[in-house]
């Protein structure tokens, strides 16, 4: 471990002890006399990133230099996001060496200037070890460090900011300005609005106050304007209101009401998709909302008591409400539109190290950083899979000592960064330098658990996650105490000495009683116990350099830059992933963690090969040959046939929270079928378990999201044995006859539809038999003579001949929907707002026009009217007195009307979509499950994003909707 060398006293002290001269830095990975760059094989790569919606080139830089072992996606993201200088100029960075040098040399110089190191040799070891860790993707700083450090622009290193607003117009207008400046810099901010008096209180002039909800409109509009002014991602923003604020019900309902507006506007034909032209007219869409609840309120909910809402001016109770009813309204709103989230105030402040300097009122947008108002936090995340030692034969161990040494290295670097960092406001700069908040965390927890044979929702999985977290934070505070001996404790420590030591004791006590599970976590717990003993001993002697040490961030862009399989504390998305290949192209691969887990659990290589092959074909482990049923849970993922339950996510959060200084960025995903009671259970049980904050997201609760097309299974149970026998008989009779072509008459009814898919215009003419369904399709694209037009002509003939030989339309629909290729994207059809290709659009439109409701519902295809009905009633089916005219109602802009025609009665099994090309793992999951992942399209490159904590991350280009 790192040592300190004795020397004369320096700096302000909380106690009368002397400071030491500087840190002695021990080598972890590097070799004396050999630079880390010289131990790596380098190669040149071409980075060309396109927008898959329209084929345009988003970014291009050729000949960049990276280690040969780096994945294509990581190279693309680091080059496009983090290299500085204009492309094509001499100032443009062309090598990862330049990028890493720009950062580590700045950190080394600042460390030397502020007397962190005992000697120049220690400074050099620090530089080399930091370079090695970044080069080999062992950890990563948050994005602002990569953006700014070592460049001529301001050296902003923090991604997370908390602001404050008081009950005055001057303060409110300052809030707008400060928030805007943070957004301009690409970061996010959050604040608590509870100091602003409610709309039920009077102004000094005698009129009624506007209330915080009113002022939220201005801030929301400002954030939306800055986003539309050229940012590559939306402003990351959080607004919080205390549960005892008199305007709390209005706050809870803000997004629910706006979501109803979105539905109405969408049904009227406006473009209300995320990023659509018309969505900007709707309010409150640029922020996450959270309600700050206290124990008094939660106990009132538990006991069914009344709860008082208090005046902001006098503190008196001005209204009493039914606590359970108010809690229900929160759950209903979250069920309907995913907002508000919930934060547990007493739990948060129980773990507050600096209560004498103020309470914790707010958080950053992703809810992992929680501390004093007008402060910031710089983040870094460790790649946990880099510390798993695996001999390839099932023997595994976690490299405890190396992990602790890397934590010490990273904490030292993070603290040094505060010495040279710039901040968006003077108040934030002063407070951050005074309290020196850090946010070390990790990524790839989900991958580590699977690789070691632990189910995410299991005692063993929670024990391993808790042990690693405890060791990380314990080592961080130990290093913080060692830094305090060298350069002094944080300025606010003297005032907060006893509370800080009390919180350290709480962490240590939680570590002492935590359950141990197996041979993997037991050594980690032992090291964690030793680290917490050192924390208490050194903290009592030296104080602490940092008021906070750890958070669990979403690790969106940086997780992809480190080639992590999973972000933050999230489980794996799916068992089969999409991988880009050097030189272009891509392939689908089964997670490397799967065979690791199988070896750990004792399976032989022949069995492993068979199980992996089954997963590659089916996307899940159900009925995998030779796999024991008790091992299925190890391979449970966030999506799929065996997805992790909502409470499984909450239990993992509770297992980690006791050893995190801040909180955990986590959204608990619920299925579309979840009830309001399920939301209440998640919110209530999280409070009981000691979680600090969370949010829920029910699939398809937002109109602006792509709607799920998952087949409903409930109708299958209604099929009787007699009906099944009839079906089998019918099918047998069908296959006994040779196909006979049934040509259409000279005069045949038809309908011509104009359409636009991803900017490509076309016309579809669908002709039908007078009494027996669709018989032919003609497709004409706007550019005659083009390859696309020719292919569409040939495709039309092939489909038409197949229809006339008796191929059921539903077979074509099941095969060709969800097929993805360009052109793709937005359409001008209100029933099919997004299409993954022209073929995808054509067969969705044909299904809506020609297939009966039951058949296309089984294929997951519904009209806009049916989707609206489902949102209102929970069912897609028309009522008994309602005629099945959805095709006519929703296609009113089309001049002609098509008579409903019955299709042949032969029953076929709904087939899965044929294998297609995916661009991201999220899209691959969609193809395997036959559903649309409930996530927005990336604003930069047009691919489907996926959840990362409370945010969304684009696997294709690294863009994120959050602040990490």
Segments from the language model and where they lie:
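Extended catalytic cores of very large enzyme megasubunits
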Residues: 1-804, 813, 830-832, 932-935
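Acidic, low-complexity intrinsically disordered tails
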Residues: 8-15, 708-748, 856-940, 948
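Hydrophobic alpha-helical membrane-spanning segments
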Residues: 691, 695, 847-855, 949
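Residue-level signature of catalytic and energy-coupling elements of molecular machines
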Residues: 759, 842, 950
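Phosphate-backbone binding interfaces of nucleic-acid-interacting proteins
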Residues: 775, 782-867, 872-874
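Short cysteine-rich clusters marking metal-coordination/redox-active sites
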Residues: 938-941, 954-957
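Short Cys/His-rich "knuckle" micro-motifs
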Residues: 947-951, 964
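Short Cys/His-rich micro-motifs in 6-15 aa windows
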Residues: 958-964
